[in-house]
Swiss-Prot record:
Residues 1-20 form the signal peptide. The lineage of its organism: Eukaryota, Fungi, Dikarya, Ascomycota, Pezizomycotina. One of its GO terms (molecular function) is chitin binding. It is found in: Secreted. Glycans are attached at residue 137. SUPFAM superfamilies: LysM domain, Plant lectins/antimicrobial peptides. In plants, chitin acts as a microbe-associated molecular pattern (MAMP) that is recognized by lysin motif (LysM)-containing plant cell surface-localized pattern recognition receptors (PRRs) that activate a plethora of downstream immune responses. Keywords: Chitin-binding, Glycoprotein, Repeat, Secreted, Signal, Virulence. This is Secreted LysM effector LysM6. Residues 392-406 have a biased composition (Polar residues). Disruption phenotype: Shows no significant difference in the expansion rate of lesion diameters in apples fruits.
Amino acid sequence: MGSFQKGIFLALCGLRLIQGTVVLSVAEPENNQIKDRALYTYPYTCPSILVGTGDTCDDLASRCSISAASFTSFNPTTGCSSLPRGKPVCCGPGETRFPPDSGGYCYAYTIRDGDTCAKIAEGYKITTADIETWNTNTSAWYGCNKLQQGGQVCLSKGEPSMPVAIGGAVCGPQVPGTARPILWTSIASLNPCPAGQCCSTKGQCGTGKDFCDSSAPAAAAPPAPATKAKSAVSEAKAATANEVTSVKTTSAPAAIAPPVPATKAISTSSTTKATSAASETKGAPLSARSFVTMTAAAVTVTVKAASTTKNADPHAFTTDIPLVDVPLTFLHPEDTKSAPAAAQTKAATGDVADFLKPAKEISILASQLRNNLVSTTTSVTKATGAAKSKAPSENSQTKKSPTQTVNGVVTVPSGWSLKMFDGIGCTGSYVLLQGHNKKLEDSTCMKFRSASTLQTDVTDTAVSCRWWTIPESGNWEWRDCHSNSLNRPKSWIMSNGLCTVSPNTKCDLVSDISQTYGWRGPGLCQDRKTVDPTFGSLKCYVG
């Protein structure tokens, strides 16, 4: 080979080397951009974006910072001629469907008011057939035609999660604190009822069609709040020997009386006519909506009021009852449930051991204590002033304060609350959101940082937000949520309601991927998982 041919050969090799270097220099930034862009916050297996109004495949490829050919290879089934708004598309290898998590469990979705399988499938870009297939083993799954509000369904392959706990449930897998069985086929046998009774879909034992009917209930919405109930003692006068006293409720609001001291309650029960009737009803099954009423003798909770300073310790008492928190998924917290007279007679005889056996009764007691905490803890009144104050007349009614101040923290006992922590395991600084609205449509779109309109004052007419931190001084302090907040909390506690979170800032719960969080039972703390979205905006309600 002559020198001229060698020169040509070396020149060609140099050009190939330069071309390869250019290709590498172009390809590497493309991959880095895909990994580094903050846009990819949606819980998919591939880095993805959502199709916007009027987007073309070229527009989407440009937003992904990749070539049109790469976009086509990552989305082989996407038709560029018809791109529906809100459809997720991949900017890298993978697929947009949710995979099972690291434990093999499915991606769980909490049913909200107004949900249908068609709406859920459209929002998560799956099919109704997928939902039916993935939920064949889900507890309390009755098909797409009978979705149960507050229940959970699988939106991916994997083992179903435990059903959401129901406050006051006494049987079945939805009793608060029930652990997952080793064999999923054993879930129906958890917390069985006594012999001869069946467990209803609401977790109550009894007999008859409402308890022993294996068919699914009608699509259920949460019951309407009932804040006025007749006393079981007075109702027992008309009860027969083999009947359980019924509970009559009205929708008219009424003040809830504070709990009666234990000694007084026992003496009153023993002198009423209900005692003899109650003893005859012993052993009768409870109705589906009954709760065992326990007197204040079972547990004593001492609440001390303190000054309302910003440095007060917020952990001493908040919206959660000490020891156990009992927000309800299906039952409103202000519902007053009268017990069968048999339960009161049992309390009067002093059988305290029965109160300590099942955890469900402790939960019920905590719920009633929360509803009956008196508003007098909002301020410290001198003993001399209390002695001079007039006793209220028998016909007068005292309106219960919607807010309480305990150890410097103002709370709304009958409302919902959400604590979002910056540490795993619900530790560290946190944002405390509190409200009172009962329905999702009554909630305003809540946002943080400069767009926030949330106030720090806790009232019964608006949502409040406080950002609690511990500065170098070592004392807890709070400030507003306008400048500092958490849009990706590492853990959170949802009490007495549900919050629907959306990664956008417009509370767009249809076109974007949203998730609903509710009370999960004792322990309460929920740590962030890879499938949890950014907390861009949210709506919360008692539910």
